[in-house]
Amino acid sequence: MTFNHKTIEELHDLLVKKEISAVELTQATLADIKEREAAVDSFITVSEEEALAQAAALDAKGIDADNLMSGIPLAVKDNISTKGILTTAASKILYNYKPIFDATSVEKLYGKDMIIVGKTNMDEFAMGGSSENSYFKTTKNAWDSSKVPGGSSGGSATAVASGQVRLSLGSDTGGSIRQPASFNGVVGLKPTYGRVSRFGLIAFGSSLDQIGPFSQTVKENAQLLNVISGNDPKDSTSSQEEVPDFTSKIGQDIKGMKIALPKEYMGEGIDSKVKETILAAAKHLESLGAIVEEVSLPHSKYGVAVYYIIASSEASSNLQRFDGIRYGYRAEGIENLEDVYVKSRSEGFGEEVKRRIMLGTFSLSSGYYDAYFKKAGQVRTLIMQDFAKVFEKYDLILGPTAPTVAYDLGSQNQDPVAMYLADLLTIPVNLAGLPGISIPAGFVDGLPVGLQLIGNHFDEATIYQTAAAFEATTDYHKQQPVIFGGEK
């Protein structure tokens, strides 16, 4: 028996009425994972034993009728710490690492009696846009196994898109939730920087990283964000801002909503069919009463360059802790202390991670700091100011999530710069610390296209309101890949 076509509210109803137990729902989810895993390779670890034990304890305690998430299974990206469950960040250097603590976001999941069924595959240390940089396996797109799933949260996206789980958590440093959501036709949101605690997230770029939800529908996405949001004394960058009910505006119409369409988001490098799909989505929002107008974000063209200096610099610092001494992989044939560091890091890190550590170390080095890192910080401020100016007059910004649909596996491995440029539409949102969502908006050559909606700081509720209005009047989110029972 499978329950993966049922919404969270429908599953909650079944659990409360005792038509199914938490153990039965967890067993069904584990069966869905096993059945589809060979086709998509979403998971690094399936935590069957822990999940079933948790479900059994919940059945003994009883489902809380007032807690929508009680007994709901989900998957978690493998760079989010889970006590006693392997957390590798898809790296050889952490191949055997079991944290002794839970990330705050995981604590919040457990606090709502949610059941973690496994840890999803990703690009190593979240560095990449295709999930091909994993030490363990290559995740495949849920719609076409010859295509990339996007990255770095590829496994979290394919787990939802293929019907293995209804919900998952990912992390987004430069588009790592939104781009795989776009490539797999699911809903993925990067919250405002500081909305969700980063404590327990294995750091890549500390001023950019943010944990966020994947789901089948907009409402379920908001329901999961309700669980994981809030201030955390363990994360000094987590916000004191009050957490609203993110579902509160869902169902409200969008008449008079002012939406900006930056001309830079529809320019050079954007596939013509993707552009047509997004313009059609903009027209559809206009038909619902929104006002869509063209604007300019002049400094967004520098976003990719700025991002790769800042993110790589932060990574070169953050990844110094993986030294072969405290935990994780240690090379053999060691003769002295320097050997421990050099060999363990050389053998333990993959090529892309080493590339970014070198780039970041160079950007921070004496003589280049002013020309690169300092300058990147100044341009980042200009990018933030561009957004602030637009949000003085507009409620949201609209554009494609990615410039293309999913591309062939292996096609960009030898050209890292081409892969970096694929994030040009998502990166500015991280640089400015803004919230952004990707929702299904159509298909090009049988592959999903994501519509990106960007909101002002801490205004996720307006993003969800507009995304839900679009979803309620289109059927793109109802179209499923063959692996999930869709039509060929």
Curated annotation (Swiss-Prot):
Annotated active site residues, numbered on this chain, are 77, 152, 176
Enzyme class, first EC level, given as a word: ligase
| Gene3D superfamilies assigned | Amidase signature (AS) domain
Q: What's a single GO BP term from this record? A: translation
Q: Name one GO cellular component term.
A: glutamyl-tRNA(Gln) amidotransferase complex
Q: Name one GO molecular function term.
A: glutaminyl-tRNA synthase (glutamine-hydrolyzing) activity
State the coiled-coil residue ranges.
Answer: none
- Which EC number(s) does UniProt give? 6.3.5.7
| Superkingdom, natural source | Bacteria
Per its record, the protein catalyses: L-glutamyl-tRNA(Gln) + L-glutamine + ATP + H2O = L-glutaminyl-tRNA(Gln) + L-glutamate + ADP + phosphate + H(+)
Keyword annotations: ATP-binding, Ligase, Nucleotide-binding, Protein biosynthesis
Its quaternary organisation is: Heterotrimer of A, B and C subunits.
Give the family per the record. Answer: Belongs to the amidase family. GatA subfamily.
The role this protein plays is: Allows the formation of correctly charged Gln-tRNA(Gln) through the transamidation of misacylated Glu-tRNA(Gln) in organisms which lack glutaminyl-tRNA synthetase. The reaction takes place in the presence of glutamine and ATP through an activated gamma-phospho-Glu-tRNA(Gln).
Name the UniProt record assigns to this protein: Glutamyl-tRNA(Gln) amidotransferase subunit A
Source organism per UniProt: Streptococcus sanguinis (strain SK36)
User: Which gene is this protein's source?
Assistant: gatA
